[in-house]
Regions:
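Surface-exposed, charge/polar-rich loops and edge strands
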Residues: 2-42, 46-176
């Protein structure tokens, strides 16, 4: 049995793509997932399963129960912990002036592909580093609107390929 993390993209934002996390938890348990827990209302799920490929099962549950076609990023908990263990020294500094994110790629694109599509980060305003299939991204809160990556990650054609979590959220998920 493996422990997994499922990250749902774009749910419960401004009343759109509404999914009750307790209902989703119950549906997952009824489908054979074990030790299911959710964190926040933004689509962070931790569970144990014997299934090798849980992603289509989760997507189908969401489609059938909530009538929503929501992309799911699935990662083994051990892989997530490895990613966090290899975070750049500048990421998750604890500074309230910085916003530290981890970008997960939903599409078949590699992290390098996404980075190339978005382009270089804004000098002195943001930092980006790729590790395996994710991108660490940090920017100053006071200048976020000037950041190249801030603008590009929300554009059509790119936003759909990503799901983004803050450093704090990812750390909390990894402790479950």
């Amino acid at each position: 049995m493996n422990k997994y993390v499922a990250l749902l993209r774009g749910i419960n934002i401004s009343g759109k793509n509404r999914i009750d996390m307790s209902e989703l938890k119950s549906e997952l348990e009824a489908s054979g997932f074990r030790e299911v827990s959710t964190y926040l209302n933004s689509g962070n799920i931790v569970f144990v399963s014997e299934m090798a490929n849980c992603k289509p099962v989760i997507e189908n549950i969401i489609l059938q129960k909530f009538k929503l076609d929501i992309p799911v990023y699935l990662i083994e908990m051990e892989e997530l912990k490895d990613i966090l263990a290899h975070s750049p020294i500048w990421w998750d500094s604890g500074s309230k002036d910085k916003y530290d994110n981890l970008i997960f790629i939903l599409s078949s694109d590699s992290a390098e592909d996404i980075s190339a599509i978005i382009g270089n980060p804004s000098d002195n305003l943001e930092r980006v580093e790729i590790y395996k299939s994710v991108i660490f991204w940090t920017f100053e809160r006071s200048t976020y609107q000037k950041c190249h990556w801030w603008k590009k990650t929300s554009e059509n054609g790119i936003a759909e390929r990503l799901t983004i979590r803050t450093a704090n959220t990812v750390k909390k998920i990894s402790q479950r």
